[in-house]
C-alpha cells in the first residue's frame, strides 16, 4: 500500500542521557549537527492529519488509544482524562498504572462510554507496574498475564477477545539501569513471543503498549550513545525483530511512515528532553498482517501531556 512519510535519550527509569555529534562536513553543518545531536536543533515531529479510511476506502470503525501514564493518580492530576474525553476512543489501554484495583481513582468512572474496565497490578508491589483496558463494547473474553508464573507476578498483560480480533495490552519489563534485568527481559521476550504466536494462530491480533524497546536507529534521537542502555541493546532489538517475524506482526506506524524521523513516544524528565524532542519510540501498535488492509492510520500524539510518554492512537476499518 502507499507509504505516507519520510532518524536518542535514554531508556525510561532514569538511565543517563547521552548525545553524540554527527560527523563534521563543514563549519556551518557541523554546528547544526552538533546542535541537533545535543537536542537543540529543529528536530520536532508534527503529527499529520488523521487518515480515517482504509487503503480500499472503507471508513474507520474502531479507534484504540494506548498510553503509559506513569501513575494513574498523577496522570489524572495532570489532566490526562481531559485528553481521553476529547480523543474519545472506543478502547483505551493504559500502562504503568501503579495502582491496585481497590485503589482506583473515582474519576475513571467519569469516562463517557468506557464502562467495561479491566485492571491488573502486582499483588505484592503497590505503586509499581500495572495495566488497564477500558472499552465501550464488552469483550467476549478477558484474561490476565501470559500463562507463565515467572512472568505473571507484575501485572503486565491484559488480553481481550472481540468478534474479529484479539487485543493485547502490555507493559514490557525494562532491562533496567545497568541492564540488571536484561537476562530476565530476554526470558520474557521468548515467553511473550510464544504466547502471542498462539493467540495469533486463532484470531487476528492487535498488540499495543509500552514495549520498552526502540527497534531501529530512527526510533530514538541518540542511537550511537545508547547501544549499551536499556531499550536499545542488541539483545532487545533482536528480540523485537524476532517477535515481528515469528508471530508474525507488523509495526503499524512504520508500515505507514517508514522513513519519518523524530517520531517519539517517551522523553526522560531530565535535561528538558521533551522540549528538545530528545526521545524514544517505545510505544507501539503491532498488527497481524491480515489486519493491514483494515489499517487507516497509526498516530503519535506527541503534544498530549500528562506523563513521560505520550499517547498513541490506531484507526481500523473492520
Swiss-Prot record:
Q: Where is this region: Necessary for interaction with YBX1, binding to RNA, NPM1-dependent association with rRNA, endoribonuclease activity on abasic RNA and localization in the nucleoli?
A: 2-33
Q: In this chain, where does the modification S-nitrosocysteine occur?
A: 65, 93, 310
What else does the entry mention about this protein? Extract of mitochondria, but not of nuclei or cytosol, cleaves recombinant APEX1 to generate a mitochondrial APEX1-sized product. The specific activity of the cleaved mitochondrial endodeoxyribonuclease appears to be about 3-fold higher than that of the full-length form.
Q: What is the effect of changing residue 65 to S?
A: Does not abolish NO-induced nitrosylation. Enhances NO-induced nuclear export
Q: Look up what happens after changing residue 93 to A.
A: Abolishes partially the redox activity
Mind giving the lineage of the organism this protein is from? Eukaryota, Metazoa, Chordata, Craniata, Vertebrata
Q: Which organism is it from?
A: Homo sapiens (Human)
Q: Impact of changing residue 12 to A on the protein? A: Reduces nuclear localization
Residues covered by region (Mitochondrial targeting sequence (MTS)) = 289-318
Task: List the protein's name.
Answer: DNA repair nuclease/redox regulator APEX1
NCBIfam families with a match to the protein in the record: exoDNase_III, xth
- Residues covered by region (Disordered): 1-60
Please list the cofactors this protein needs: Mg(2+); Mn(2+)
Q: Quote the subunit structure annotation.
A: Monomer. Homodimer; disulfide-linked. Component of the SET complex, composed of at least APEX1, SET, ANP32A, HMGB2, NME1 and TREX1. Associates with the dimer XRCC5/XRCC6 in a DNA-dependent manner. Interacts with SIRT1; the interaction is increased in the context of genotoxic stress. Interacts with HDAC1, HDAC2 and HDAC3; the interactions are not dependent on the APEX1 acetylation status. Interacts with XRCC1; the interaction is induced by SIRT1 and increased with the APEX1 acetylated form.
Amino acid at each position: 500500500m502507499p507509504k505516507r512519510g519520510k532518524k536518542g535519550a535514554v531508556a525510561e527509569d532514569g538511565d543517563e542521557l547521552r548525545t553524540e555529534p554527527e560527523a563534521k562536513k563543514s563549519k556551518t553543518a557541523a554546528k547544526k549537527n552538533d546542535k541537533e545531536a545535543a537536542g537543540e536543533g529543529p528536530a520536532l515531529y508534527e503529527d499529520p492529519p488523521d487518515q480515517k479510511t482504509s487503503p480500499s476506502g472503507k471508513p474507520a470503525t474502531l479507534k484504540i488509544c494506548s498510553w503509559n501514564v506513569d501513575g494513574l493518580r498523577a496522570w489524572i492530576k495532570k489532566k490526562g482524562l481531559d485528553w481521553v474525553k476529547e480523543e474519545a476512543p472506543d478502547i483505551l489501554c493504559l500502562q504503568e498504572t501503579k495502582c491496585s484495583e481497590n485503589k482506583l481513582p473515582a474519576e475513571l468512572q467519569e469516562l463517557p462510554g468506557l464502562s467495561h474496565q479491566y485492571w491488573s497490578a502486582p499483588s505484592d508491589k503497590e505503586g509499581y507496574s500495572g495495566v488497564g483496558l477500558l472499552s465501550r463494547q464488552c469483550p467476549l473474553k478477558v484474561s490476565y498475564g501470559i500463562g507463565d508464573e515467572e512472568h505473571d507476578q507484575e501485572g503486565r498483560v491484559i488480553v481481550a477477545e472481540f468478534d474479529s480480533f484479539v487485543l493485547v495490552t502490555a507493559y514490557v519489563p525494562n532491562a533496567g539501569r545497568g541492564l540488571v534485568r536484561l537476562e530476565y527481559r530476554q526470558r520474557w521476550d521468548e515467553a511473550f513471543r510464544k504466547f502471542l504466536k498462539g493467540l495469533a494462530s486463532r484470531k487476528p491480533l492487535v498488540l499495543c503498549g509500552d514495549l520498552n524497546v526502540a527497534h531501529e536507529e530512527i526510533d530514538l534521537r541518540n542511537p550511537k550513545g545508547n547501544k549499551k542502555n536499556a531499550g536499545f541493546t542488541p539483545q532487545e532489538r533482536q528480540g523485537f525483530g524476532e517477535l515481528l517475524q515469528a508471530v508474525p506482526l507488523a509495526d503499524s506506524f512504520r508500515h505507514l511512515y517508514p522513513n519519518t524521523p523524530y517520531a517519539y513516544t517517551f522523553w526522560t524528565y531530565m535535561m528538558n528532553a521533551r522540549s528538545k524532542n530528545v526521545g524514544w519510540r517505545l510505544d507501539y501498535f503491532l498488527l497481524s498482517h491480515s489486519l493491514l488492509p483494515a489499517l487507516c492510520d497509526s498516530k503519535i500524539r506527541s503534544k498530549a501531556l500528562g506523563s513521560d510518554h505520550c499517547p498513541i492512537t490506531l484507526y481500523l476499518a473492520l
